[in-house]
């Protein structure tokens, strides 16, 4: 039997994959993917599941049909680490921190962590993957509850409900102080048009509000279907009377609401956040409230939870605050308990988990052979989606694998998953892997098709090149379009290094590392020198340059690899070169 391979030796942590011996999943002989194999436990062979925070009774009852359930609440870290070595699964909400020390203390027995809710900020995913522990969540059951809470905060804020309630309970009768604003005819900008955002939009429409939304990857027809207008981020925040945040917390959205964005808003705007605390720069919001740019804010989530006792934002008279109650309805908590219980039980049985957020198991030999192609597939997906004009909505992706191998000798499921990961994960809080990629793509309305191009020659390399096309979208870089109008990028592995070899109709030779500037230009002498000079003057290190052209003296595309992101001023200088017709900066 082949030995298990430490993932860190062949993949970066972002790939979120672990391996299993080849005898468990021999290629082309068994297509089922074994996620977890439950070891023998006490209690007549039943696994043991530890629940550390209150879970709906329906979920507990479901767990007890399959496992021995230990409900131990308010455990210290030391107590949790002591108990965990006797448990096969752990179920938590947001209050239990599941860090590396917990996985180390489990001594390899802990196989599944279930998060009763959506966010997994309190679980160390890297450590979970390293220790071979699957992490699942319950992302759907609390959608309606979160949307209802968002609307409740919206209306309570507009009519000063919390402040008026506190006043009358203090024995006062000050009606004039709490004159509110009407919602009818006002513009609500919903930032993030996922499940919760779209439900908030539906309800706001019912209140007579004009609803606009910004989500760069939401299809416009999906928004139109419920009477919502899809607009740019700048239009959304500058025209809204109310803003409701429904964004995942990612590197791109962290502190998205800051001094700069507040300055772009209407004076007197009102903001609701039932998403993630970190999307708002809380110090900047406090300044915006004090200056009157933001008239009121209604917050259910905070950067640090619970907030400190004397938190100025919570105490501000224009802020309505609740202690992370978005999912706190009896119905939602029962639904979440059932959803997480089903996911944990299924994982312990070795079934596929559509809500897995870190790591399925795949054959060792497949990982070894496809390692550079996995990186190539993800980078091509990431590059292609950055070429899409915001608001176009990605709904049709085609992946082509050119190979001299027979179709049944090339397992592309992992590559397909990584293309999806590259396209969706940068703009989502969802972690994409082999298990949940198709599920997430379908959920977001993205249709993925694949085709094989059989080449003549030796099957020494599993794949000669991979092509990713995105159809029915507008491109930020017109030269990336194929003859049929699709965004098209193509790449291959050269000496173990993933490389970009084609953009649209133009051939290039670009190592897919760092970042790249693509420029379309008139093919004439001196262009490389002009661009290199601008970058050098701004201390931007150039790692490579490549030029592809249709014919001498006609159009050409130049690809410039850079180690860091140039400033806007630097990019403008490049764009101002007369012979350059268009350019785009892409993070790889």
Swiss-Prot record:
GO CC terms for this protein? chloroplast; chloroplast stroma; mitochondrion
Q: Name one GO molecular function term.
A: NAD binding
Keyword Chloroplast annotated:
yes
Per its UniProt entry, which superkingdom is the organism in? Eukaryota
Under which EC number(s) is this enzyme classified? 1.1.1.95
Quote the gene name from the UniProt entry. Answer: PGDH3
Do you know which NCBIfam families this protein is assigned to?
PGDH (TIGR01327)
Top-level enzyme category: oxidoreductase
**What is this protein's name?**
D-3-phosphoglycerate dehydrogenase 3, chloroplastic
Sequence ranges assigned to domain ACT in this UniProt record: 516-588
Where is this chain's protein located in or outside the cell? Plastid, Chloroplast
Q: Please list the GO biological process terms of this entry.
A: L-serine biosynthetic process; photosynthetic acclimation
């Amino acid at each position: 039997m082949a030995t298990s391979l430490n993932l860190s030796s062949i993949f970066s942590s972002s790939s979120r994959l672990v391996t299993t011996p080849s005898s468990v999943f021999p290629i082309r002989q068994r297509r089922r993917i074994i996620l977890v194999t439950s070891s023998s436990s006490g209690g007549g062979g039943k696994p043991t599941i530890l629940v550390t925070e209150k879970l709906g009774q329906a979920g507990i009852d479901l767990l007890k049909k399959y496992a021995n359930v230990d409900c131990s609440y308010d455990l210290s870290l030391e107590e949790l680490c002591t108990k965990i070595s006797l448990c096969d699964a752990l179920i938590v909400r947001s209050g239990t921190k599941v860090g590396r020390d917990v996985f180390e203390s489990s001594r390899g027995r802990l196989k599944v962590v279930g998060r009763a809710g959506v966010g997994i900020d309190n679980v160390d995913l890297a450590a979970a993957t390293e220790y071979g522990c699957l992490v699942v969540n319950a992302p759907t059951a609390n959608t309606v509850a979160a949307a209802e809470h968002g609307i409740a905060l919206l209306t309570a804020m507009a009519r000063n409900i919390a402040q008026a309630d506190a006043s009358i309970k203090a024995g006062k009768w000050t009606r004039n102080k709490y004159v509110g604003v009407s919602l009818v005819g006002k513009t609500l900008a919903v930032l993030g048009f996922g499940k919760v955002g779209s439900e908030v939009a539906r309800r706001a429409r019912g209140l007579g509000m004009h609803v606009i939304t910004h989500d760069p990857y939401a299809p416009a027809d999906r928004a139109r279907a419920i009477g919502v207008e899809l607009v740019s981020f700048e239009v959304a925040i500058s025209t809204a009377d109310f803003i409701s945040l429904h964004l995942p917390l990612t590197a791109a959205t962290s502190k998205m609401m800051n001094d700069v964005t507040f300055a772009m808003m209407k004076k007197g705007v009102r903001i609701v956040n039932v998403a993630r605390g970190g999307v708002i720069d809380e110090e900047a919001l406090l300044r915006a409230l004090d200056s009157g740019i933001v008239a009121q804010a209604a917050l259910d989530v905070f950067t640090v939870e619970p907030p400190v006792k004397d938190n100025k934002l919570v105490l501000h008279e224009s802020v309505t605050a609740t202690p992370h109650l978005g999912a706190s309805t009896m119905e939602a908590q029962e639904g979440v308990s059932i959803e997480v219980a089903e996911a944990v039980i299924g994982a312990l049985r070795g079934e596929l988990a559509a809500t897995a957020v870190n790591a399925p198991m795949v054959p060792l030999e497949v990982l070894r052979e496809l390692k550079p192609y996995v990186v190539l597939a993800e980078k091509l997906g990431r590059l292609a989606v950055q070429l899409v004009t915001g608001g176009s909505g990605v709904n049709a992706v085609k992946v082509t694998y050119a190979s001299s191998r027979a179709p049944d000798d090339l397992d592309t499921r992992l590559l397909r998953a990584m293309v999806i990961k590259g396209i969706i994960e940068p703009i989502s809080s969802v972690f994409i892997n082999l298990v949940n990629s198709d599920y997430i793509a379908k959920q977001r309305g993205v249709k993925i098709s694949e085709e094989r191009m059989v080449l003549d020659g030796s099957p020494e390399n599993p794949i000669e090149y991979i092509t990713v096309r995105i159809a029915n979208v507008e491109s930020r870089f017109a030269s990336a379009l194929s003859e049929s109008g699709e965004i098209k990028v193509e790449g291959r592995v050269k000496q173990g290094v993933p490389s970009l070899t084609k953009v649209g109709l133009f051939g290039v030779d670009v190592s897919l590392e760092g970042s790249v500037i693509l420029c379309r230009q008139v093919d004439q002498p001196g262009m490389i020198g002009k661009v290199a000079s601008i970058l050098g003057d701004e201390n931007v290190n150039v790692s490579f340059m490549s030029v592809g052209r249709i014919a001498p003296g006609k159009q050409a595309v130049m690809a410039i690899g850079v180690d860091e992101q140039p400033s806007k001023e630097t990019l403008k200088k490049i764009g101002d070169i007369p012979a350059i017709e268009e350019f785009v900066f892409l993070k790889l």
